[in-house]
Regions:
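A substrate-engagement module of RecA-like helicase motors
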Residues: 2-57, 68
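Short beta-strand and adjacent tight-turn residues that come in two discontinuous sequence segments
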Residues: 60
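Conserved helicase motor core of SF1/SF2 NTP-dependent helicases
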Residues: 1-15, 23, 49, 63-65, ...
Length: 298
């Protein structure tokens, strides 16, 4: 949500928006847009209604919006854009899908679900067998497994409809170098991904993807840490830092992704041992939490 707020704040002339959520989960730069802070300037209910009616963009997590059903009594929304929709299970969306405005209309006129079912699914602890749906009525509407998102269920319906125009694919991407995109493009997207042709995508890089083997950590009890890998990551971070020199930017140049939080701590410890202060500030995080972020080198 912070990423969306950052993008909205960068638009000129400035776009008015209200963020639904708590200060604890909101970047300090965007706290002035929080619903509570915006309405604190209102002196009476009439001013609250006017302020909320005048603001055309509301931003928040699914949980934050769903936890404020009173919002839909005061405001009718023409469109809701649900980002990362393939990571959201149907029950999590139900409150918003069923929201009603005070006159009985749907609280939201239209939904646009944006996501990629080829990437990270929703985090579910049950196995496929435990979450499988056996009820024939539910299976007839395409609900075969409770681990599936509404996005994926509707997408399957789209594949069955010959002339359905409810689904489209964004084929042009500006993040990955073609060499990085090659494997997922071939294996998951039927070769449909195209590079925008931005400067970083046109660079003549010998090997935009490198695989560096590492030895197993025999001292790791949980199997969720590997000191050998952490040392390799730290050394690579130092190499990138020295390569970029004065152009190295903490929030843009380098990021590290690893599956487990315990490995994050180990990697940070190895990086700190290098004695390069700038590297202590780089983002080291899990796959789930890195969604939506971007760096020159991962």
């Amino acid at each position: 949500v912070d990423e969306i707020c950052r993008s909205l704040s960068a638009i000129l002339p400035q776009v008015d928006y209200i963020r639904v959520g708590s200060e604890l989960s909101c970047d300090a730069r965007f706290r002035k847009h929080l619903l509570e802070n915006v309405l604190a300037e209102c002196n009476n209910r009439r001013e609250v209604n006017i302020r909320m009616a005048d603001c055309r963009i509301y931003v928040g997590t699914v949980a934050s919006i769903a936890s404020k059903p009173e919002l839909f009594k005061l405001k009718h929304f023409d469109v809701a854009i649900v980002d990362e929709a393939t990571q959201i299970l149907e029950p999590q969306l139900l409150g918003i899908l069923c929201a009603r405005f005070k006159d009985g209309r749907n609280g939201i006129g239209k939904f646009i679900l944006i996501g990629d079912h080829k990437q990270l699914p929703a985090v579910v602890l049950q196995s496929n067998e435990q979450s499988e749906v056996h009820d024939e009525g539910l299976r007839r509407i395409g609900l075969y497994n409770l681990k599936d998102s509404l996005f994926e269920r509707l997408y399957r319906f789209h594949l069955q409809e010959e002339h359905c125009r409810a689904v489209d694919m964004l084929c042009r991407q500006g993040r990955m170098h073609p060499g990085v995109a090659s494997f997922p493009n071939r294996e998951f997207y039927a070769g449909k991904l195209e590079a925008l042709g931005l400067p970083h995508q046109l660079e003549n890089v010998d090997a935009p993807v490198r695989f560096i083997p590492s030895e197993r950590d025999t001292e790791s009890v949980s199997g969720k840490t590997n000191r050998n890998e952490a040392r390799i990551v730290a050394q690579l971070a130092a190499d990138v830092y020295h390569l970029y020199k004065e152009t190295f930017e903490v929030n843009r140049t380098l990021g590290v992704i690893t599956p487990y939080r315990s490995q994050i701590a180990l990697i940070r410890k190895e990086i700190q041992a290098l004695g390069i202060s700038a590297l202590n500030e780089i983002s080291v995080d899990t796959v789930e939490r890195y969604q939506g972020s971007e760096r020159d080198v991962i």
